[in-house]
Protein backbone atom coordinates (compact mmCIF):
# COMPACT_ATOMS: atom_id res chain seq x y z
CA UNK A 1 0.00 0.00 0.00
CA UNK A 2 1.27 3.48 -0.92
CA UNK A 3 0.13 7.06 -0.65
CA UNK A 4 -0.04 9.35 -3.67
CA UNK A 5 -0.05 13.06 -2.98
CA UNK A 6 -1.66 15.38 -5.52
CA UNK A 7 -1.69 19.13 -5.99
CA UNK A 8 -4.34 20.93 -8.01
CA UNK A 9 -2.94 22.74 -11.04
CA UNK A 10 -4.60 26.10 -10.36
CA UNK A 11 -3.56 27.58 -13.72
CA UNK A 12 -5.35 24.81 -15.60
CA UNK A 13 -8.40 24.98 -13.31
CA UNK A 14 -8.66 28.76 -13.67
CA UNK A 15 -8.36 28.40 -17.45
CA UNK A 16 -11.20 25.85 -17.41
CA UNK A 17 -13.32 28.22 -15.32
CA UNK A 18 -12.81 30.97 -17.88
CA UNK A 19 -13.78 28.58 -20.69
CA UNK A 20 -16.97 27.66 -18.83
CA UNK A 21 -17.81 31.28 -18.00
CA UNK A 22 -17.82 32.30 -21.69
CA UNK A 23 -20.85 30.14 -22.66
CA UNK A 24 -22.40 30.96 -19.26
CA UNK A 25 -22.42 34.69 -19.98
CA UNK A 26 -23.72 34.05 -23.51
CA UNK A 27 -26.56 31.99 -22.01
CA UNK A 28 -27.31 34.68 -19.42
CA UNK A 29 -27.40 37.34 -22.15
CA UNK A 30 -29.84 35.42 -24.38
CA UNK A 31 -32.02 34.52 -21.39
CA UNK A 32 -32.31 38.24 -20.68
CA UNK A 33 -31.44 37.87 -16.99
CA UNK A 34 -28.17 39.83 -16.88
CA UNK A 35 -30.08 42.74 -15.27
CA UNK A 36 -30.22 40.71 -12.05
CA UNK A 37 -26.42 40.67 -11.77
CA UNK A 38 -26.12 43.69 -9.47
CA UNK A 39 -24.18 44.27 -6.27
CA UNK A 40 -26.79 42.51 -4.14
CA UNK A 41 -26.54 39.43 -6.35
CA UNK A 42 -22.78 39.12 -5.83
CA UNK A 43 -23.19 39.57 -2.07
CA UNK A 44 -25.70 36.71 -2.08
CA UNK A 45 -23.39 34.63 -4.28
CA UNK A 46 -20.56 35.21 -1.80
CA UNK A 47 -22.65 33.47 0.88
CA UNK A 48 -23.79 30.88 -1.70
CA UNK A 49 -20.16 29.78 -1.86
CA UNK A 50 -20.21 29.18 1.90
CA UNK A 51 -23.25 26.96 1.35
CA UNK A 52 -21.31 25.11 -1.36
CA UNK A 53 -18.60 24.16 1.15
CA UNK A 54 -21.15 23.35 3.85
CA UNK A 55 -22.71 20.81 1.47
CA UNK A 56 -19.31 19.20 0.94
CA UNK A 57 -19.13 18.84 4.72
CA UNK A 58 -22.61 17.31 4.87
CA UNK A 59 -21.53 14.83 2.20
CA UNK A 60 -18.51 13.88 4.32
CA UNK A 61 -20.66 13.54 7.44
CA UNK A 62 -23.24 11.33 5.71
CA UNK A 63 -20.35 9.14 4.53
CA UNK A 64 -19.31 8.44 8.11
CA UNK A 65 -16.75 11.18 8.79
CA UNK A 66 -16.93 12.59 12.33
CA UNK A 67 -17.95 16.24 12.68
CA UNK A 68 -14.62 17.13 14.32
CA UNK A 69 -12.71 15.85 11.28
CA UNK A 70 -14.43 18.24 8.85
CA UNK A 71 -12.48 21.49 8.41
CA UNK A 72 -13.66 24.68 6.69
CA UNK A 73 -11.61 27.60 5.47
CA UNK A 74 -10.99 30.43 3.05
CA UNK A 75 -7.82 31.20 1.13
CA UNK A 76 -9.00 33.88 -1.27
CA UNK A 77 -5.47 34.74 -2.44
CA UNK A 78 -5.72 31.34 -4.16
CA UNK A 79 -9.32 32.05 -5.13
CA UNK A 80 -10.93 29.34 -3.01
CA UNK A 81 -13.16 28.48 -0.10
CA UNK A 82 -12.62 24.91 1.02
CA UNK A 83 -13.85 21.98 3.06
CA UNK A 84 -11.27 19.39 4.12
CA UNK A 85 -11.66 15.87 5.47
CA UNK A 86 -9.09 14.87 8.10
CA UNK A 87 -10.22 11.22 8.21
CA UNK A 88 -9.51 8.61 5.59
CA UNK A 89 -12.65 8.15 3.52
CA UNK A 90 -13.41 5.59 0.81
CA UNK A 91 -13.95 6.24 -2.89
CA UNK A 92 -17.75 6.27 -2.61
CA UNK A 93 -17.65 8.76 0.26
CA UNK A 94 -15.48 11.36 -1.49
CA UNK A 95 -17.53 11.09 -4.69
CA UNK A 96 -20.73 11.74 -2.71
CA UNK A 97 -19.16 14.80 -1.08
CA UNK A 98 -17.86 16.14 -4.40
CA UNK A 99 -21.28 15.95 -6.08
CA UNK A 100 -23.45 17.34 -3.26
CA UNK A 101 -23.05 21.06 -4.14
CA UNK A 102 -23.23 20.40 -7.89
CA UNK A 103 -26.63 18.73 -7.66
CA UNK A 104 -28.29 20.47 -4.70
CA UNK A 105 -27.42 24.13 -5.34
CA UNK A 106 -26.55 23.73 -9.01
CA UNK A 107 -28.71 21.43 -11.11
CA UNK A 108 -31.66 21.11 -8.71
CA UNK A 109 -31.95 24.80 -7.81
CA UNK A 110 -31.51 25.77 -11.49
CA UNK A 111 -34.69 23.92 -12.45
CA UNK A 112 -36.51 25.17 -9.34
CA UNK A 113 -35.58 28.73 -10.36
CA UNK A 114 -36.88 28.17 -13.90
CA UNK A 115 -40.17 26.68 -12.69
CA UNK A 116 -40.88 29.55 -10.29
CA UNK A 117 -39.27 32.20 -12.55
CA UNK A 118 -36.82 33.11 -9.81
CA UNK A 119 -33.94 34.30 -11.96
CA UNK A 120 -31.70 35.20 -9.02
CA UNK A 121 -31.82 31.50 -8.10
CA UNK A 122 -31.15 30.56 -11.74
CA UNK A 123 -28.06 32.80 -11.80
CA UNK A 124 -26.78 31.51 -8.46
CA UNK A 125 -27.19 27.95 -9.71
CA UNK A 126 -25.36 28.64 -12.99
CA UNK A 127 -22.47 30.36 -11.20
CA UNK A 128 -22.27 27.45 -8.75
CA UNK A 129 -22.15 24.90 -11.59
CA UNK A 130 -19.20 26.74 -13.14
CA UNK A 131 -17.63 26.96 -9.67
CA UNK A 132 -17.78 23.15 -9.48
CA UNK A 133 -15.07 22.78 -12.13
CA UNK A 134 -12.51 21.54 -9.59
CA UNK A 135 -15.03 19.16 -7.99
CA UNK A 136 -15.98 17.74 -11.39
CA UNK A 137 -12.34 17.28 -12.42
CA UNK A 138 -11.81 15.28 -9.23
CA UNK A 139 -15.02 13.30 -9.79
CA UNK A 140 -14.18 12.29 -13.37
CA UNK A 141 -10.65 11.40 -12.27
CA UNK A 142 -11.71 9.34 -9.25
CA UNK A 143 -14.35 7.23 -11.00
CA UNK A 144 -11.61 5.83 -13.26
CA UNK A 145 -9.36 4.80 -10.37
CA UNK A 146 -9.25 1.47 -8.53
CA UNK A 147 -10.29 1.51 -4.86
CA UNK A 148 -8.54 4.03 -2.65
CA UNK A 149 -8.82 5.99 0.58
CA UNK A 150 -8.94 9.79 0.41
CA UNK A 151 -7.62 12.20 3.05
CA UNK A 152 -6.71 15.90 3.28
CA UNK A 153 -3.53 16.81 5.13
CA UNK A 154 -2.13 20.33 5.13
CA UNK A 155 -2.82 21.87 1.72
CA UNK A 156 -6.16 23.36 0.71
CA UNK A 157 -5.25 22.86 -2.96
CA UNK A 158 -4.09 19.26 -2.59
CA UNK A 159 -5.06 15.86 -1.23
CA UNK A 160 -3.75 12.34 -0.67
CA UNK A 161 -4.98 9.02 -2.07
CA UNK A 162 -3.95 5.75 -0.39
CA UNK A 163 -4.21 2.58 -2.44
CA UNK A 164 -2.87 -0.93 -3.00
CA UNK A 165 -2.74 -0.10 -6.72
CA UNK A 166 -0.11 2.00 -8.45
CA UNK A 167 -2.07 5.21 -9.05
CA UNK A 168 0.93 6.85 -10.72
CA UNK A 169 -0.17 5.04 -13.89
CA UNK A 170 -3.32 7.18 -13.99
CA UNK A 171 -3.52 10.81 -15.10
CA UNK A 172 -5.89 12.97 -13.06
CA UNK A 173 -7.58 15.98 -14.68
CA UNK A 174 -5.81 19.21 -13.64
CA UNK A 175 -4.05 17.38 -10.78
CA UNK A 176 -0.30 16.80 -10.48
CA UNK A 177 1.16 13.84 -8.57
CA UNK A 178 3.85 15.50 -6.44
CA UNK A 179 4.98 12.60 -4.24
CA UNK A 180 4.30 9.04 -3.11
CA UNK A 181 5.46 6.76 -0.33
CA UNK A 182 4.58 4.79 2.78
CA UNK A 183 1.24 5.88 4.36
CA UNK A 184 2.85 5.57 7.81
CA UNK A 185 5.07 8.53 6.90
CA UNK A 186 2.13 10.88 6.38
CA UNK A 187 1.93 13.72 8.90
CA UNK A 188 -1.13 15.94 9.21
CA UNK A 189 -1.13 19.48 10.59
CA UNK A 190 -3.43 20.14 13.53
CA UNK A 191 -5.85 22.47 11.75
CA UNK A 192 -8.41 24.54 13.60
CA UNK A 193 -12.07 23.90 12.82
CA UNK A 194 -12.20 27.08 10.73
CA UNK A 195 -9.13 28.50 8.96
CA UNK A 196 -9.12 31.91 7.31
CA UNK A 197 -6.04 33.49 5.72
CA UNK A 198 -5.08 37.11 6.46
CA UNK A 199 -5.94 38.17 2.91
CA UNK A 200 -9.37 36.55 3.29
CA UNK A 201 -9.99 38.46 6.55
CA UNK A 202 -9.22 41.72 4.75
CA UNK A 203 -11.50 40.76 1.87
CA UNK A 204 -14.34 39.91 4.27
CA UNK A 205 -13.97 43.29 6.00
CA UNK A 206 -14.07 45.14 2.68
CA UNK A 207 -17.20 43.20 1.69
CA UNK A 208 -18.81 44.03 5.03
CA UNK A 209 -18.05 47.74 4.64
CA UNK A 210 -19.45 47.78 1.10
CA UNK A 211 -22.55 45.97 2.31
CA UNK A 212 -23.09 48.54 5.08
CA UNK A 213 -22.63 51.38 2.59
CA UNK A 214 -25.11 49.78 0.18
CA UNK A 215 -27.86 49.46 2.79
CA UNK A 216 -27.35 52.56 4.93
CA UNK A 217 -25.91 55.29 2.70
Locations of regions flagged by a protein language model:
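Short membrane-interface loop/juxtamembrane segments of multi-pass integral membrane proteins
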Residues: 75-93, 167-168, 173-189
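Short pre-active-site segment immediately N-terminal to the catalytic Zn-binding motif
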Residues: 33-49, 90, 94
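Active-site recognition of the HExxH zinc-binding catalytic motif
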Residues: 48-61, 101
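Catalytic Zn2+-binding segment of zinc metalloproteases
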Residues: 56-69, 145
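Juxtamembrane/start-of-transmembrane alpha-helix segments at the extracytoplasmic/lumenal side
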Residues: 188-202
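Juxtamembrane boundary at the C-terminal end of a transmembrane helix
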Residues: 209-217
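A glycine-rich, hydrophobic loop/mini-helix early in the fold
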Residues: 36, 40, 44, 66-79
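Metalloprotease/metallohydrolase-associated module, dominated by Zn2+-dependent proteases
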Residues: 1-31, 76-164
Amino acid sequence: MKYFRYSMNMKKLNFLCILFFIPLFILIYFMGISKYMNFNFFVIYFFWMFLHELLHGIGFYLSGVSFNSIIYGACLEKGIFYCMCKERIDKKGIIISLLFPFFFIGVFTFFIGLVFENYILVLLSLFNIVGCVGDLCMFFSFVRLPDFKYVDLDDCTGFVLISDSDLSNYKLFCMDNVSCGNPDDLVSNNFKKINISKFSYIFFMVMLILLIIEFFV
